[in-house]
């Protein structure tokens, strides 16, 4: 009754979703975008949404058949970002309990994105580079204890894993400047977190998957012509991170 022309859902199948408003909008173009990284599927044998916003990297042409929606392709990356996302950093490593001379790998994804395969790769890097530390987001005590215990069982001192407390968003974005490399997760990449890192000029090493949520960091890197940081398997992921660690000139050029 509100005569809405275009309805864009930014939540999808997430908390407080109102996705099923869409079928009630009879003369409205409906679009699935951003909040839910994937197809919303069918309702009563019809697509729940008319369109999904994507790009050529996120949804390769051969994968269109897996989406109920028609694909609207943006020219660079499906995720737009503002130019002034960069934040001045007014703190130092000691403020966050990080040794000043450490090489800092960060991964500010939520803990549920950390799989055993990815975490093992991170531990491989910690073992390879004794002066490095891993800086993660503090999610909850269970995740913190499990990750630390797993590291200890695999011969890595858990004190080399430092957990970042939650802080205001501006400070969170700014503290990326204290890290050297952002290590991505799979099968659920960094999304907004990847944009935060790139805004602060931190290189991201990602492992490209086959699904929407596993290709987001790759999409952002591809749009910046940083395809060298998009890897195909866990071995090349470790190799890419190692090159960035060892070659400071290459890292600065990136």
Segments and roles (model prediction):
Residues 2-3, 48, 175-178:
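Alpha-helix C-terminal capping/helix-to-coil transition sites in glycosyltransferase folds
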Residues 2-13:
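Short N-terminal targeting/anchoring amphipathic segment
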Residues 3, 16-29:
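Glycosyltransferases and closely related glycan-assembly transferases
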Residues 4-6, 29, 51, 181:
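Short, Asp-centered acidic motifs that coordinate Mg2+ and/or phosphate
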Residues 17, 171-172, 193:
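Short acidic active-site motifs
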Residues 25-90:
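Active-site-proximal region of nucleotide-activated glycan assembly enzymes
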Residues 76-168, 175-177:
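Conserved catalytic-core segment of nucleotide-activated headgroup transferases in glycan assembly
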Residues 177, 181, 185-254:
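Catalytic binding pocket for nucleotide-activated donors in carbohydrate/polymer assembly enzymes
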